[in-house]
Amino acid sequence: MRGEMMRIVENIAALLLVMLLLGCERSNPAGLENADTEVSPPPRGYVMARWNEEIPDVEYAGDCPFGFNVTEEDYFPEQWAVWMAERLRLRDQGGYLPWDDDRLPPDACQDPLAQPDPGFLTFDGPAIVYGLDLDGQNSRQLGAQGGSCAHDDFAGHTGERGIDNQSWRLMGCVRGYRPNDLIDRLHEGSTSIKEGGFALLMEISGMDDPMNDDEIEVQLLSANHPVTVDAGGDLMHDVSYTAHENTRYHNEVAKGKIENGILTTEPVDFRIKAKQQTMDNEFWFRDARLRGEVQPDGRITGIVGAYWDMANMFSTLNDQWIGQYHQGRNAAQSRGFMCAGIYHAMPRVADGHPDPETGRCTSISTALHFEAVPAFVIRPALAMAD
């Protein structure tokens, strides 16, 4: 009996030895069908430390030979004088007079057809601006090809032609949007981001080499909480942010590439949630594409070129509230334009997405500066699981 058991043990040992030898001869161990398969790199996350419209430096911005646009106070001086006197009287008594008071003309910021066109001044001359060529042509006012409306393109800082930025045509003769004025100073300090107005995230997937990679994917997502700043007021790197719980703000993934440190993407639409000061709204950009430079410290800086939906642009400029009181008129007054003027001027400068029935363009080309710093992007499902 004992001899029989010994033979069984010897047979099992021999079988195990054969299996081991056969396993060693295989090109790949069991369970690894392709040991040479490369593992995809983990996604890289970023948060925007800068995100603002292009306002050219003063030496490149061009001139407004007919001056700047007027405000309602300039256009309706008698009614505004009566309203202001009553406003100051009530303020001294601890009261408040709303901006849509009957002493003023009908509020065109709430109903843009409530006032006539005041003759809004657009910027019609040459300028040197940052931006991208969105339509693939050096457009001229005398004509346009399919997919756009006639407009004069700008020149870029490296001599390139065909830069599409009709937003500067619209706002270039508004005093508050001129170089070194109100909006430019707010942009310089990234005020809207740092004060908690919005946090915009970016995630890049498939980036094997930050300097050269012929196939990456880029996605922009709104965050559900403000950015984190250090004691000096600068955005902190490598902070975790949770993406917005509403997937409406998890935008379409854009295919892209990196060549010699220059990142570019194909066009996609995206929406950005913003809740800052008197605005609770979203930005809607169409056919947006990025061109950025990867920096040695991991940041990415560059330009977004996009078409800003015209109706959305008017809404973000004028749909402002403090409690029950509409503040669009207040915002327009402080920046230096009339809502009726902006409304009537927008179709004149619009250059993208022609309406199939009327042929009129419904979006306005724009350029935005961005600076993305390394961060960790957490999806809402993962955040809840934690």
Question: Which ranges hold each PLM region?
Answer:
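C-terminal motif of bacterial Sec signal peptides marking the signal peptidase cleavage site
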Residues: L21-G23
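Bacterial N-terminal signal peptides that target proteins for export
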Residues: G3-A13
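Generic secretory/membrane-interface signal
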Residues: E4-M5, M19, S363-S365
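Extracytosolic secretory-pathway proteins
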Residues: S27-D386
